[in-house]
């Protein structure tokens, strides 16, 4: 197809965005311009509270992997992202299980990279002078 191949592997880029409210599994070509498949945890489960769960992320990743194989992608580089910025830099609960599901589905894993946006110096974080009081 139109993807560069490396040692007879056809690569795509799996961008996993794992927040504490949802998990996105989005596969593009190497340039990032062409979307091949994008599935979220919320598309796979009915209850709102389960959108970010590892189970929903696993189902989303399996769907994406099936679509990739259909198109002819055999390997993916993974870019894992948390919310970042002034919010949490820790990936949500679905990140790890989405990555594992992609690996177990038969897709080869190239490079794994954390692309969470980290501010060099940012605007003030929400919560006020005395912070969030529980």
Curated annotation (Swiss-Prot):
Q: Which InterPro entries does the entry link to?
A: Ribosomal_uS11, Ribosomal_uS11_CS, Ribosomal_uS11_sf
Biological process, per Gene Ontology: translation
Q: One MF term from GO for this chain?
A: structural constituent of ribosome
Which residue ranges does the record annotate as region Disordered?
Answer: 114-134
**Keyword Cell cycle belongs to the record:** no
PANTHER family according to UniProt: 40S RIBOSOMAL PROTEIN S14/30S RIBOSOMAL PROTEIN S11 (PTHR11759)
Q: What is this protein called?
A: Small ribosomal subunit protein uS11
């Amino acid at each position: 197809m139109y993807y560069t191949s490396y040692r007879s592997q056809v690569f795509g880029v799996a961008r996993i965005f794992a927040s504490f409210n949802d998990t996105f599994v989005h596969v593009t070509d190497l340039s990032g311009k062409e979307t091949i498949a994008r599935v979220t945890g919320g598309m796979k489960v009915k209850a709102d509270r389960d959108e970010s769960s590892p189970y929903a992320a696993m189902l989303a990743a399996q769907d994406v992997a099936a679509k990739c194989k259909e198109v002819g992608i055999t390997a993916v580089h993974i870019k894992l992202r948390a919310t970042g910025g002034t919010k949490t830099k820790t990936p949500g609960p679905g990140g790890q299980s989405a990555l594992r599901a992609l690996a177990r589905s038969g897709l080869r894993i190239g490079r794994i990279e954390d692309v969470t946006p980290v501010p060099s110096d940012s605007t003030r974080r929400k919560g006020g002078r005395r912070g969030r009081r529980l």
